[in-house]
């Protein structure tokens, strides 16, 4: 399985791809929010071993990821969006548990 994490920002997106075994495929691919940038991502996704599942994830920003979502849907890629507030609460809650145990 491939895990694709995309950092969403106002002017560009940054992509990280790894396998379930921890092999890094792409460490920091900067994608412009243009057709060319999205095609760069699509070509990278298509170059991956198609026998493996691809899991694409990013934080929901409300607006900045809209073009990316439409592009992924149009090209038959599913994705998961995470609420950044919930992610932050989850992380801080788990870090608290670790601190308490130590």
List where the protein language model places each region:
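Phosphate- and other anionic-substrate recognition elements at nucleic-acid/protein interfaces
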Residues: 1-102
């Amino acid at each position: 399985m491939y895990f694709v994490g995309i950092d969403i920002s106002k002017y560009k997106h940054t992509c990280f791809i790894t396998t379930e075994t921890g092999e890094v495929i792409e460490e920091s691919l900067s994608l412009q929010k243009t057709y060319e940038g999205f095609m760069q991502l699509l070509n990278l996704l298509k170059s991956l071993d198609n026998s493996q599942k691809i899991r694409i994830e990013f934080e929901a920003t409300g607006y900045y990821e809209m073009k990316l979502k439409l592009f992924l849907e149009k090209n038959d890629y599913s994705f998961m969006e995470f609420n950044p507030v919930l992610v932050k609460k989850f992380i801080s809650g788990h870090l608290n548990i670790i601190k308490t145990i130590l």
